[in-house]
Design a protein with these regions (language model features):
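C-terminal intramolecular chaperone/autoprocessing and neck/assembly modules of extracellular spikes
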Residues: 2-75
């Protein structure tokens, strides 16, 4: 199964757009509401649906292997 990472806007705060990928996807810097650190990635509601999975908890996750954006912790 693909590795998917939490990417639902409802789980994030301090969301700042920092750029776009080559394919035109918005790239954001953000913090998770319930987790320490600052991360870089996408918002699940803005990307192709084939890269979005819905977890058992009802929140979206993203299969980053289908995107030209890397998810990473930056702080």
């Amino acid at each position: 199964p693909p590795v998917s990472l939490p990417s639902d806007r409802r789980l994030k705060k301090n969301i700042i757009k920092i750029g776009e990928s080559e394919s035109g996807l918005n790239i954001y810097e953000f913090e998770y509401i319930n987790k320490k650190g600052t991360y870089q990635g996408v918002m699940s509601d803005e990307i192709p649906k084939e890269a979005v999975l819905v977890g058992d908890n009802g929140y979206d996750t993203v299969d980053y292997s289908k995107l030209d954006v890397d998810f990473k912790r930056i702080k």
